[in-house]
C-alpha cells in the first residue's frame, strides 16, 4: 500500500503537521526522511525495517553507511541523507553531554563514548581529559590501529595531559569486532599509562572498551 492510500490521519507527514513530531513513531519519522519506497514496500515499511534491523534509533546512531546497504531499496542517495541526519543527531547529543554533564560516573562517560566511538570501523585509542571537577576539557583520538603497549606512547598522553592542565583522564578504545571483554593487552596498557600519568599527578579514573552495543568499564571490573 502506498502512503497516499493510507487514511489522512495515518500518513506520517499529515500526522506530524497536525499533532507534532512527538506523535510519530520512529518508523514514521524515518519514513518522512526516506520519502519513497519501492514496489511492494512503502517508505513506512522501510522505516520499520530499519528500526527492526538495527535495534531502534539508538542502534541506528551507531550504524555506518556500509551496514545500511543491507536494506533493500535504500540506494546511495537515501543512505547519504540518512547518514547525514544521524551524524547531526550524534553531534547534537555529544555537544549536550559535553556542555551539561559532569563525567563523575561510569554511566555518564559510557553514554558519551558510545556516541563518539561506538560506530567506528577501525580501532581507535582516545583520551578524555578532565578538570578537577570531572568536567570534560577535551576528547582526543591519539592512536589508531591494533593497540599494544608499543603502539600507544605514554609520553604523548602525558604531554597532552600537561598541555591541557588535566587533573584526571579516562582512557577509551573501541573493539570493532564487537567483543567488549578487555584483553590482557588492554590491562597491561592501562597499568603502563596509569604509572606514567601518576608521575605528573594525573589520575586515570577508568578505561572503557567500546563496541557498537556497549561500553565496558575496566574500573567496574576491578581491572584498574
Swiss-Prot record:
CDD domains: MPN_DUF2466. GO terms for molecular function: metal ion binding; metallopeptidase activity. SUPFAM superfamilies: JAB1/MPN domain (SSF102712), RuvA domain 2-like (SSF47781). It comes from the Bacteria. The keyword Metal-binding applies. PROSITE patterns: MPN, UPF0758. Keywords: Hydrolase, Metal-binding, Metalloprotease, Protease, Zinc. Coiled coil: none annotated. A motif (JAMM motif) lies at residues 173-186. It holds the Pfam family RadC. GO terms for biological process: proteolysis. InterPro entries: MPN, RadC_JAB, RuvA_2-like, UPF0758, UPF0758_CS, UPF0758_N. Gene3D superfamilies: Cytidine Deaminase, domain 2 (3.40.140.10). Zn(2+) binds at residues 173, 175, 186. Residues 102-224 form the MPN domain. The keyword Zinc applies. Belongs to the UPF0758 family. This is UPF0758 protein Bpro_0948. It comes from Polaromonas sp. (strain JS666 / ATCC BAA-500). The lineage of its organism: Bacteria, Pseudomonadati, Pseudomonadota, Betaproteobacteria, Burkholderiales.
Amino acid at each position: 500500500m502506498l502512503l497516499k492510500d493510507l487514511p489522512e490521519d495515518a500518513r506520517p507527514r499529515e500526522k506530524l503537521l497536525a499533532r507534532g513530531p512527538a506523535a510519530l513513531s520512529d518508523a514514521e519519522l524515518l519514513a518522512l526522511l526516506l520519502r519513497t519506497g519501492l514496489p511492494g514496500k512503502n517508505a513506512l515499511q522501510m522505516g520499520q525495517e530499519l528500526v527492526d534491523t538495527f535495534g531502534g534509533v539508538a542502534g541506528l546512531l551507531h550504524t555506518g553507511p556500509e551496514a545500511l546497504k543491507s536494506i533493500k531499496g535504500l540506494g546511495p542517495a537515501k543512505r547519504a541523507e540518512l547518514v547525514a541526519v544521524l551524524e547531526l543527531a550524534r553531534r547534537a547529543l555529544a555537544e549536550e553531554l559535553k556542555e551539561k554533564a559532569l563525567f563523575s560516573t561510569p554511566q555518564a562517560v559510557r553514554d558519551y563514548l558510545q556516541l563518539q566511538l561506538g560506530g567506528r570501523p577501525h580501532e581507535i585509542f582516545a583520551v578524555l581529559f578532565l578538570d578537577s571537577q570531572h568536567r570534560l576539557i577535551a576528547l582526543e583520538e591519539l592512536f589508531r590501529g591494533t593497540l599494544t603497549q608499543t603502539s600507544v606512547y605514554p609520553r604523548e598522553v602525558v604531554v597532552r595531559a600537561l598541555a591541557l592542565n588535566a587533573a584526571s583522564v579516562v582512557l577509551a578504545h573501541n573493539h570493532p569486532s564487537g567483543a567488549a571483554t578487555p584483553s590482557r593487552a588492554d590491562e597491561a596498557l592501562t597499568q603502563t599509562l596509569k604509572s606514567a600519568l601518576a608521575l605528573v599527578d594525573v589520575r586515570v579514573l577508568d578505561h572503557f572498551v567500546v563496541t557498537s552495543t556497549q561500553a565496558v568499564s575496566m574500573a567496574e571490573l576491578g581491572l584498574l
